[in-house]
Amino acid sequence: VRGFHIFGFQSFILTKKEVEDFYEIYKGIPNQDYHGLVRQGSSGRCLVLALSQGSGLKLTEEIPSVVEAFRKLCGPSDPEVCRVLYPDSLRAKYGGMNQEENAVHCSDLEEDGILEVEYFFTLLQPYQSV
């Protein structure tokens, strides 16, 4: 993706427990189908990217971080909303019919991004041979 530097890329087939651990923070949050997220996340192969700012990514007051820039590229979590309001977003192009099948997970906060990279590339990667 233009403007981002990919410093980590790995294919995973996650167990239900690994997905439950990853999405633990969403458990009990209104408008989040935790069980749907777990079901979708453990349904097959997923590709995990770790991104940083590349030379083509210009941060501004409106988009102050790599996380915000990637969230904008992904679009809102509902692919149907994306198709109407953000037709060029990743979720509009590749998402399914609901929030669980929205094609892309992206961190909510800069701090979450760091923890999520550590989860996949430090905790899980040594145990994955996919």
Model-derived features: where do they sit?
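Non-catalytic terminal and connector segments of soluble metabolic enzymes
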Residues: 1-130
